[in-house]
Regions:
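Flavin (FAD/FMN)-binding glycine-rich loop and adjacent Rossmann-like elements that form
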Residues: 1-204
Length: 204
């Protein structure tokens, strides 16, 4: 089936958009390479994207990263296809904030974020490189019947906790990431623990 949407109004912008970050992003946002989450400045390209192979039990990729329905977990016919939530680096909206700005600025960025989401879908449908050659997955489609929205996009923007929480103390990767803790403690992996917090109810 071909569910290719019309090119989004801002597709030309997002197709060429390179995040202005330090350390630098590895290239265009609409690509499968992205900055390594634990090693800033390094590129990570290992996930890839192949809904068909990932459905059949191939290695994990972007499709299965936030998959909520895998047809193999249900009786045949229960679902026509897998269903995934797209919460990837490629649809992280970077040009502005919506939580500490005037209403007009907020509306501008909400519109921009929707355009980015639609542009990512259109790019995946038409231009995303396929491992076996060729480009695009035209069978991809939004699911308004699942999201409960007219267009199939999310009901609300997802704002990461670090942007919206006003904490007494912020736990960071340096407190829990094995490599950082090994360096901090001077220990081997098997002897390394997360940083202890006396007032913690649980870290996980």
């Amino acid at each position: 089936e071909d569910h290719t949407i019309d090119p989004p109004e801002d597709y030309a912008f997002w197709r060429e958009y390179v995040p202005a970050l330090t350390p630098p992003w590895p290239g265009k946002l609409l690509a499968f390479a992205y900055s390594h989450p634990q090693k800033p400045g390094e590129s990570r390209e290992g996930l890839g994207f192949d809904p068909i192979a990932e459905n059949k039990g191939g290695r994990m990729g972007f499709w299965s990263y936030r998959r909520i329905i895998h047809t193999h977990n249900f009786v045949p016919g229960a679902y026509a296809s897998d269903i995934t939530i797209v919460n990837w680096p490629q649809n992280d909206y970077l040009p502005g904030s919506i939580i500490d700005v005037p209403r007009e600025e907020k509306e501008k960025h909400l519109r921009g974020a929707r355009q980015l989401s639609l542009s990512l879908l259109y790019w995946l449908q038409t231009e995303a490189p396929r491992a076996g050659g060729g480009t695009g997955w035209p069978g991809l489609r939004l699911r308004p019947d699942i999201t409960g929205t007219p267009d199939g996009l999310a009901k609300y923007p997802y704002i990461r906790e670090s942007r919206r929480i006003l904490a007494e103390f912020t736990i960071t990767a340096r407190h829990v990431w094995a490599q950082a803790r090994m360096q901090e403690m001077g220990t081997k992996y098997e002897d390394t623990t997360a940083a202890p917090f006396d007032d913690s109810a649980g870290v996980g």
